[in-house]
Design a protein with these regions (language model features):
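N-terminal accessory regions of nucleic-acid-interacting proteins
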Residues: 1-28, 32
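Active-site-proximal helix-loop-helix substrate-binding element of RNase H-like nuclease domains
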Residues: 6, 49, 54-69, 79-162, ...
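Catalytic-core regions built around general acid/base machinery
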Residues: 16-19, 68-78
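Short, surface-exposed beta-edge/turn micro-motifs
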Residues: 25, 44-45, 78-79
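Short active-site-proximal "capping" loops at secondary-structure junctions
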Residues: 33-38, 64
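Short, solvent-exposed polar/charged micro-motifs at secondary-structure junctions
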Residues: 37-41, 114, 143-146, 248
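A short alpha/beta connector and helix-capping loop motif
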Residues: 38-54
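Accessory DNA-binding and partner-docking regions appended to nucleic-acid-acting proteins
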Residues: 148, 164, 168-291
């Protein structure tokens, strides 16, 4: 395991960025631990892991006074940001912080062009049990302090990206795919990533087969769930799962009080406050476009 510095203040971040710049670093491996409606509402950048080829850095964005201080590190940076599968991380930066990292090198784009369909650990040969990886990935990365095993896991994903980049770029050149990679990689970097949680109401099971009236009720229910989740900083799935929403629709339950009673019937945790849910339904009915 490579040594790493834990960056927890704006001053430490500025010092690290200046040190990397002064050292003439040209490539910086990067990965992000994020949260998307798992333990709290919405999209969050919880941790940023970096490796310059010799030393690792873990930046805690939750401890920064101003996340704009990340921009000299990530936006129009003087180094390539080496990622493996950057899409979700770029979405998180864009919507949680208003940051659009560049220039990036997304190694998953290179791997797919070469017909390599494995994940990062498959391509680097770095093993580990699937159960352990799943446990770490589902950990609450927003909780502080983070344990040493979590920090060690986090930094491990960036330690082999330089070597993987060298290998994949050489193979792209050999097979005449370097220009195709350049184009696709730039598309990945510059894509405008839209996150609109209100637009996903069609994910309710069997939505398209519902009657027009039930589709309208389902949409209001989805909006109200999102509003309640925002108000209580609660993942929408903990307010009402898609299965529960379909049951509410099928049972013809329409009033907020009845819906709250249905959701709370067998719950000891994540109980819904009827009055708050009622306010969310009132607001949802105003927001849902009329058919």
């Amino acid at each position: 395991m490579a040594a790493y510095d834990l960056i927890q203040t704006d001053a430490e971040l500025a010092h690290m960025t200046a040190r990397l710049r002064d050292a003439g670093v040209k490539r910086l491996a990067i990965d992000v631990e994020g949260e998307n409606n798992l333990h709290r509402y919405g999209i969050h950048v919880a941790l940023i892991q970096l490796f310059d080829g010799a030393r690792g850095y873990i930046v805690d964005p939750l401890s920064l006074r101003d996340t704009n201080s990340l921009k000299p590190l990530l936006e129009n940076a003087p180094w390539e940001l080496i990622w493996f599968d950057a899409g979700n991380d770029l979405l998180s930066f864009q919507h949680a912080m208003g940051i659009k990292p560049s220039p990036i090198v997304d190694l998953v784009v290179a791997a797919r062009l070469l017909g390599k369909n494995g994940g990062l650990h498959d391509l680097t040969g770095e093993g580990g049990s699937a159960r352990a990886k799943d446990r770490f990935q589902r950990a609450n990365w927003l909780r502080r302090p983070l344990t040493a095993p979590l920090l060690d896991y986090a930094i491990s994903d960036v330690l082999h990206l330089h070597e993987l980049q060298d290998s994949l770029m050489a193979e792209l050149e050999q097979k005449g795919l370097a220009e195709a990679f350049r184009v696709k990689n730039l598309q990945t970097q510059n894509a405008e990533r839209v996150w609109d949680p209100y637009a996903n109401y069609t994910r309710i099971s069997g939505f398209k087969g519902l009657s027009r009236e039930d589709r309208e009720s389902a949409r209001v229910l989805w909006y109200a769930r999102e509003l309640y989740g925002q108000a209580h900083d609660m993942p929408p799935g903990n307010v009402a799962s898609k299965q529960e929403m379909r049951m509410i629709i099928d049972k013809g339950i329409r009033s907020a009080d009845q819906i709250a009673a249905f959701l709370n019937e067998n719950r000891s945790r994540n109980r819904v406050v009827p009055a708050d849910l009622s306010r969310c339904f009132t607001e949802a009915e105003k927001q849902v476009p009329q058919a």
